[in-house]
A protein has these predicted regions:
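Extracellular glycan-associated modules
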Residues: 1-119
Length: 119
């Protein structure tokens, strides 16, 4: 599984996505793919309407073909070491390539969950 995490991190570093406007306490992120195409979105999980497309176009060099080997990792880290940072709260995998409307609805639902830092 660690190889899958490292491969994804390497792939994402191979092109410069647009940065988020400002740091957030809770981040919602989506990675969507189909043949020859990759979309990455992120937004503030406490603010409706903040979902931003960071990349929507061709896959990075070396990842043009969808090779589906390996494990699926949802979370922070992947090798059970204590060196990861952050916290992972929820994850989901779906089939197909979701519409803009579906992505916005998911974002609104996450915001409605009311993630907050306690006192």
């Amino acid at each position: 599984m660690l190889n899958a995490v490292e491969n994804m991190a390497s792939m994402l570093r191979s092109f410069p996505p647009e940065p988020m406007d400002e740091p957030v306490d809770f981040l919602l992120a989506m990675v969507k793919g189909r043949k020859g195409h990759l979309a990455i979105k992120a937004g503030d999980a406490q603010r409706v309407g903040s979902l931003k497309t960071l990349h929507d176009g061709p896959r990075p060099s070396g990842y043009e073909t969808m090779r589906k080997q390996g494990g699926i990792v949802l979370g922070v880290g992947g090798d059970n070491s204590p060196w990861g940072s952050g916290a992972f709260f929820e994850g989901v995998m779906t089939a197909g390539f979701s519409s803009e409307e579906a992505d916005a609805a998911v974002m609104a639902n996450v915001v409605a969950a009311g993630y907050a830092i306690g006192d």
